[in-house]
Amino acid sequence: MEDLKPREIVQELDKYIIGQDHAKRFVAIALRNRWRRRQVPQDLRDEIAPKNIILIGPTGVGKTEISRRLAKLADVPFLKVEATKFTEVGYVGRDVESMIRDLVEVTVNMVREKEEDEVALPAMKAAEERILDILLPPRRETQPFADAEGETTLEIVTRGDSNQDSTREKLRKMLHSGKFDDRYVDLEINERNTPVVEIFSNMGMEEVGFNFKDMLGGLMPKNTKKRKVKVSEAMEILTQQEAQGLIDMEKVVKKALSRVEESGIIFLDEIDKIAVGGGKGQGPDVSREGVQRDLLPIVEGTTVNTKYGMVKTDHILFIASGAFHMTKPSDLTPELQGRFPIRVELDSLTEHDFMRILTEPKNAIMLQYQELLKTEGVELVFTQDSVAEIASIAKEVNDRTENIGARRLHTVMECLLEDILYDAPEVPEKKITIGAEMVRAKLESIKEDEDLSRYIL
C-alpha cells in the first residue's frame, strides 16, 4: 500500500480523521517519498534521507491518530513512544536505543504472523492428522526378530488397515462438522522454561537482555506438559505449533530487519516535554538536554545492536509531536531541530469539527454507542439538534476548563448515556431517541457548575 498517491492517502485518512488537512498532506508526501526513493538509482538511494516531521498542537486534535492510521494504511512497522520515558533519574544513552529494539520486536512478530497465515492451510491439515492420531491411535504390532544376542521384539506402527482407514475418515467428517469440539483430549505441549538473565555492564549500568533460549536454541531440553483441553482448543494449539515448524525464522528476521530499516515509522510523543525553556542548564533541564543529545544520533542515523542483528536507523521516519504550551520548537537544541525540518501546526477543533467527529468517520463515536446498544436489542437514534447540542457543550467545557480536544466528546457521551447503558438489558422501550432537550436536561447542571464540569466532564 506504500505506492498510494498522496491524494489517495489523504482520502483514506479523511475516513477516520476530521480536519487537519495540512498535517495529512505532509504525512502523505512523506509516505509517497518512501516509494519515490525506492525508484531512484541505487547509488543515490542511500543519500536520500526521510524528512522528519514535528506535529504541533493541543492534545486530542489528531496528532497520534494521523500517524497510527498512516502506518496501518501503508502496513509498515510502527511504534509510539513517549519522549518523557527517557527523562528518568539515572537515564543513560542506551535506553534511547530501546525504541529501535522495540520496533524490531514488533516487526518480527508482524512478519511472523503473515508467514504463519501463508502456511495456515498445510498447518491445519497437519494439526488435523495429529488430532485424529489422538482420537484413533495408529495400530501397533510387535514382531520378533533375531539379533546377535538373541531374540528381541520390534514394534511397528501401521496405519494401512482398511477398517482403520474408514474409521479415520468417519472421524475426520465428525471433526469437520464440530461434533468433537467439546470433547476433551490429553495434549502434550512443548515448553521451554528458560530464564531471562539481565546483565548490567559497568558502563552506566546499561541493560542488555540475554535469553538463554535464544543463545542455545535447540540445545535446551524441551519440557513437555500434558494438558487436558477441548478438541477445538487443541486444534488451535497444534495448528500454531505446526505453523511455527513450517516457517523459516531466519528468513522472517531478515525480512523484518529490512522492513524496519526501509519502512519503519517511530512516533515520538510529547517531545515538547524535553525542550529546555528559559534558564538553561539548571536542575532537570540538564537531563532534558542530555535526552536530546542521546536522541540525535538515532534520528540522524546510526547503527543499533538488537538481539536479531544490527539495524541502521538512517531511513526510519520519525514523527514527533507536542503541544508546546510552556516551550517552543526553537527551545529544542539546534542540532535536533535540524533533524525535524518539517513543522506542521494543527488547528484547535471547532464546534463544527465536533459535530463531524460525532457522525462522519468510519469509527464515529455515535456509531460506536449505537452498535454497542444494538447487542442488547436497543436502537439508539440521535436527532440532528442533539448532535449540535453535544458538540456545543463539549466545546464550551473545553474552553472553560482544560482543552483536551475530541477526547472531551467521549466524556460527554458517557455522562449523557450513563442511565441508558446501565438500564439497557431491562429497558422495555427498544427504540430510544436522543433529542436536544434530553441532552440539555442531562448535562446542563453539570456544565453550569464549573467545579462539577472540571471533575465530571
Swiss-Prot record:
Chain coiled-coil ranges = none
Q: GO molecular function of the protein, one example?
A: ATP binding
Gene3D superfamilies per the UniProt record, alphabetical: 1.10.8.60, P-loop containing nucleotide triphosphate hydrolases
Query: Which InterPro entries does this UniProt record tie to the protein?
Result: AAA+_ATPase, ATP-dep_Clp_protease_ClpX, ATPase_AAA_core, Clp_ATPase_C, HslU, P-loop_NTPase
User: Which PANTHER family does the entry link to?
Assistant: ATP-DEPENDENT CLP PROTEASE ATP-BINDING SUBUNIT CLPX-LIKE, MITOCHONDRIAL-RELATED, ATP-DEPENDENT PROTEASE ATPASE SUBUNIT HSLU
The protein's matches in HAMAP family, at most eight in alphabetical order, are given as: HslU
What's the name of the protein? ATP-dependent protease ATPase subunit HslU
Species of origin: Desulfatibacillum aliphaticivorans
* Top-level taxonomy: Bacteria, Pseudomonadati, Thermodesulfobacteriota, Desulfobacteria, Desulfobacterales
